[in-house]
From Swiss-Prot:
GO cellular component, one term: cytosol
GO terms for biological process, alphabetical: tRNA N1-guanine methylation
Assembly and binders: Homodimer.
Record-linked NCBIfam families: PRK00026.1
GO MF, one example: tRNA (guanine(37)-N1)-methyltransferase activity
Gene3D superfamilies per the UniProt record, alphabetical: 3.40.1280.10, tRNA(m1g37)methyltransferase, domain 2
Annotated protein name in UniProt: tRNA (guanine-N(1)-)-methyltransferase
Top-rank lineage group of the source organism: Bacteria
Annotated CDD domains: TrmD-like (cd18080)
Family according to the record: Belongs to the RNA methyltransferase TrmD family.
Matching Pfam families: tRNA_m1G_MT
Length: 292
């Protein structure tokens, strides 16, 4: 996969070189280019914004800068070659991981889009965009080329978004119902959520197959050694060795956490009779944890 990020703060994207994303770069599963938008500014001050038509506070990012930048990055031509190509922040130890040792091959998730597949995907983080979901992350993990446009101030001139549809599949996307200073933080969030689902990035594919939202529910609590810590003990069922009971307990904990934190996720969800009985018990307030 190829990621390109256009921003006025290239240094903000340095975290893309670290941890698993850095390792993915090292393994040639991922390449990342970071482009300074000001390279496409033509005035002496390298300005990228101007006052809004109709008045109002703040500044709007100029189409005369964004248009050429997106044109060049789409085809990696012109000034796009001046962008920084990120290397892994450190050399990682190359040792066999879980899936390699177990002979597990993960083919990846199905792509959501087939039409216009020859066009790169342009993601524009904005509070006015559609909510970013785990389903999006799965679908976009199949993309060959994703370009991020990081807005600032009052955002990017809307004509840039409309014009970009000639060259890109454009998606305006939001990571939550709040406002950030710029799009860079959202890019880090989306990039990490997407890249970790590329086959070979995680050492154990079950790590993301058991994630929150992978089956529509939130993931339940996790525990490790020691069994007792500061007067708190690990639930007995997890040390019982009874895998069927452990699996059922984890399922119920996932249902419980979803009911307590995001009950709307249960609306319309297809549950088996055991799940239905447990959720009904939660609604009535008479379901206790099964720790035995």
């Amino acid at each position: 996969m190829r990621l390109d990020v256009i921003t006025i703060f290239p240094e903000y994207l340095d975290p893309l070189r670290h941890a698993l994303l850095g390792k993915a770069i090292e393994k040639d599963l991922l390449s990342v280019g970071v482009h300074d938008l000001r390279l496409w500014a033509e005035d002496a001050h390298k300005s990228v914004d101007d006052s809004p038509f109709g008045g109002g506070p703040g500044m709007v990012m100029k189409p005369t800068v964004w248009g050429p930048a997106l044109d060049d990055v789409a085809t990696m031509s012109g000034k796009a070659h001046m962008g920084a190509q990120l290397d892994s922040a450190r050399v990682h130890v190359d040792k066999p991981r879980h899936d390699e040792l177990e002979g597990i091959q993960f083919a990846g998730y199905d792509a959501a889009e087939v039409a216009e597949a020859d066009k790169p995907l342009l993601l524009v983080p904005t509070p006015a965009g559609a909510p970013f979901t785990q389903e999006d992350a799965r679908a976009w993990s199949n993309e060959e080329h994703i370009v991020f446009a990081c807005g600032r101030y009052e955002g990017i001139d809307q004509r840039v978004i409309e014009d970009a549809k000639k060259t890109y599949r454009v998606r305006e996307v939001s990571i939550g119902d709040y406002v950030l200073i710029g799009g860079e933080v959202a890019v880090l969030v989306i990039a990490e959520a997407v890249v970790r689902l590329i086959p070979g990035v995680l050492g154990n594919t079950q790590s993301h197959q058991d994630d929150s939202f992978s089956d529509g529910l939130l993931e339940g609590p996790s525990y490790t050694k020691p069994r007792e810590w500061r007067g708190l003990e690990v639930p007995e069922v997890l040390t019982s060795g009874n895998h069927a009971k452990i699996e059922r307990w984890r399922r119920e904990q996932s249902l419980k956490r979803t009911w307590e934190v995001r009950p709307e996720l249960l609306d319309g969800m297809e549950l088996d009779r055991h799940d239905q009985a447990y959720v009904e018990g939660l609604r009535r307030g008479n379901t206790s944890d099964n720790l035995n």
